[in-house]
Amino acid sequence: MPSLARLDYGWVVVAGLCVTETVSWGILYYGFPVMLRPMEAELGFSRVELTGAFSVGMGVAALAALPVGRWIDRHGARALMTLGSCLAVGLLLVWSRVESLPALYAVWCAMGLALAATLYEPAFAAVVGWFATGHRDRALLTVTLAAGFASTIFMPTEAWLVERFGWRTTLLVLATILAVVTIPIHALVLRRPPRGESRAAGVEWVESRVPGLTLGAAARTGVFWVLAVAFFFGNFTTNSVTVHLIPYLSDRGYTPTLAAVMIGWLGAMQVPARLVFAPIAVRFGHRAATAAIFFGQALGLAQLALAARLPTLVPMVVVLGAANGMSTLARATTIAEIFGPRHYGSISGAVALGANGARALAPVGAAFLQVALGGYEPVFWLLTAVLVVAGFGVFAVRTRETHRE
């Protein structure tokens, strides 16, 4: 009977994380762009200066990904994610009182730690150990589908609150929501998979027999570095397009409003795309499905480079948006599939160090390349070529040595 009681608890963890990831992403990640203009108007700092604080936070989150993963492998996700939520709540309260640029940067430097402890990487690590391969993809898909609606739910709500009450009061409201929703769920729902008992998928897994490489062993394989580099450039591409799409298309005769709508639809395409990733991965294998994602990003980026010559950019929006949506899920499931779940947190954190670092580097890096290469088109073509190479690399690299420690 204890086994039966534990049989479905993995799905309780998934349900809790669906709620907390949606709220955490909606407030901690998507909240900053909503606060940007009102902060600019009140504080008097330039948009570049203000967004620099956000980039610093992303950079700190990337650097913290590896130690966060190691902690979860050893101690589980409950304490870390609970403390991360508590830290985030406190920082939102401090942010609401910020008057100077150094104070804002200090808040977001610390916020990077909160992001690393509450967003996808720790959530995925909390889920993976509960499920065998056949159910793991579905569990991770469920979390990413729910969190995919974070911007849809929170950005309009935050904009309405800012318009009605101002950005400082809005941050107080968001801090309250984050505290009331995420802290209790992280503290009370999350737990480590049971040792020596059947897991949520109904498979007998004794802890000592859980398959998987250590981080050190994984780092000695070629596939680890291929994945790390590939996901770095995939994330770099996604965030470069998000930041630079409006100025690029505006220079080519598109209205800023239409360009903004395209960004919105790029995000909207991510949710349905995630639904089809699992069947594709089952049919063709995780590596083939992941390689196809990089080819899809390359195809979408090539269409974007030809924007001035194409009658419509709808195919670009569909292909690039779908590929971007699958990428987050692919990173989580492919790492677990290739390296095993035993040290998933450490390995995922190491890959995330580059992938999330790309999120911080992309806005500035793409701008630098645009100047150095003389325009956006050469940048897009360069990234297209890199993504094609990444796709072939993921598909071709050998994995016979993995998943056996």
Name what the model sees in each region.
Residues M39, A117-F131, M326-F339:
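Intracellular juxtamembrane helix-capping segments at the cytosolic ends
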Residues Y29-R37, G216-P272, A362:
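Extracytoplasmic gate region of multi-pass secondary transporters
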Residues T22, L91, P102-T118, T144, ...:
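Hydrophobic core of transmembrane alpha-helices in multi-pass small-molecule transporters
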Residues A79-L93, A288-Q303:
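Structural signature of the two symmetry-related core transmembrane helices
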Residues A64-G76, A273-G285, Q370-V371:
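Helix-to-loop junctions at the C-terminal end of transmembrane segments
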Residues L63-L101:
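Conserved MFS/SLC helix-loop-helix module at the cytosolic interface between two early adjacent transmembrane helices
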Residues V12-R47, A65, M155, V241-I246, ...:
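Extracytoplasmic
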Residues V143-P193:
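Helix-loop-helix hairpin linking two adjacent transmembrane segments in secondary transporters
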